[in-house]
């Protein structure tokens, strides 16, 4: 079987080679592919084709994908966590250093000089750009995942005192965070004690406008705020008030909107955080591997809307089911198999929210019986999508 993949944006070709020979890359021409691979393409407001089974975002965020719509249609949405983490980490650390010494403004000033006495002008004017060192300053990191954890560790190595806040940090991630990073239980402590604050959390209804009037009201004067996560995490109206009051000395963001441009205390980058050759390659490779594993085996890794499910395929056939998370669904699946006198080699059912995912491995060589079972599932209530995979 050959799977069709539609790509959006410029996906690294080395990453696409991870798909292997069983995949046909149709660029953006296919009208009804099995999978999408994309970066920043906005899919909101679009209808998904009937064959579409998977969407892989070559990046960490999925705000450009209507995840709820995909879930309801039985489409698994993947991301590539950690693939661009080092790139974003370096961008944030560079931003801290740039803001501490005001290098960008200093460069603009120096480029405006002219004449034979430029060296003299430099010596006379450089005092206005005298900054501070970051050693012994306090950095507050909100979100200690793949990116935030790296920033916290390296900021400590640069001599900073580091506070970290993340009530949802995984055990695996926690093991990789330096013991010198002080974990705080209340985000207010980050606001109150930090000279620099950087945020690395997804945009949800709970995190939207994390930096609002109340948050800025807790901060000490002269705080630098760095946002390489999502623009909407900051209430811009409250930000302007904080800038005017001197609470925020500088705001550095990777998400430009017109109202933030040309402000002397705001530095806007054109979404460069994860845009390095290495990061784009890593994201493409991870996206390619993820799509290949899912399409060929049904296994799910790094999905945002379905649980991770991994199980080696040893039986002749595997049926994957995306179903609504309702009582007795596993019993109904088992009964349907039993009614056709088919032996179950292995079954895994895991849920996430209102939906669940089932891997059903069948020790049966009669393909007609397997097809009868597939037809039965496709006509069953609360089962959204059925796939048949042959070993």
Which residues are covered by each model-predicted region?
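N-terminal Rossmann-fold NAD(P) dinucleotide-binding loop
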Residues: 148-149
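Rossmann-like adenosine-cofactor binding region
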Residues: 44-46, 168-259, 275
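Hydrophobic Val/Ile/Leu positions in short beta-strands of Rossmann-like dinucleotide-binding domains
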Residues: 5-7, 141, 321
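Glycine-rich Rossmann-fold phosphate-binding loop(s) that bind the pyrophosphate
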Residues: 144-145
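Phosphate-binding beta-alpha-beta segment of Rossmann-like dinucleotide-binding domains, i.e.
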Residues: 73, 81-138, 302
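Oxidoreductase and adenylate-handling cofactor-binding alpha/beta cores
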Residues: 89-108, 155-160, 286-299, 334-338, ...
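NAD(P)-dependent dehydrogenase/reductase Rossmann-like domain
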Residues: 273-391
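An N-terminal-biased, well-structured beta-alpha scaffold segment characteristic
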Residues: 1-80, 212-214, 218, 235, ...
